[in-house]
Amino acid sequence: MTKALLTILLLLSIMPSMAEVSRENAPLSLLNEIQYSPNLTTAGQPSEEQFRAVAEAGFQRVIFLAFTDHKNAVKNEDRIARSAGLEFVHIPVAWDAPTTDDFDTFAAVMRATEKTLVHCEVNFRASVFGFLYQVIYLGTPAEEAWALLTRIWIPNETWKTFIVSALAEKGIEYPGV
């Protein structure tokens, strides 16, 4: 009886830390969420409430890739993210004209190892940037990263051209996935 009671007390004492570990790796239930790696998740626009959940899940930084005037933008997103304890980085990427300079700016921010949520309006821009970062900087096979990306959408010609250009600029041939 005493041994069983001690076992129960031991289990109860470690359960909060086990919950913390599972919360840090659990999906956030964000629009079109993709977890590319433990430190890189992309998604569509989070709500004000979801920014707190992002911080509670162990993220340290949010990168916003859309413009602040899109119809689903959260007003004062920068202040909301900061008040949740998140670093906020805004890299506005034109939907119809993404540039490799946009991606290079993104990659420079990503080189720090903080757990990062990258988002835009519906996770189209962000998923492409996540794909490119995984392939170019983390050595993820293109087919593997592409499979994650295409769970959300099939890039249109503008974005396929951008992908080819960004890969070519880094000396990587587009695998035609």
Where do the language-model regions lie?
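Positively charged n-region of N-terminal signal peptides that target proteins for export
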Residues: M1-A4
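Substrate/cofactor-recognition hotspot
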Residues: N123
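Short cysteine clusters
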Residues: C120
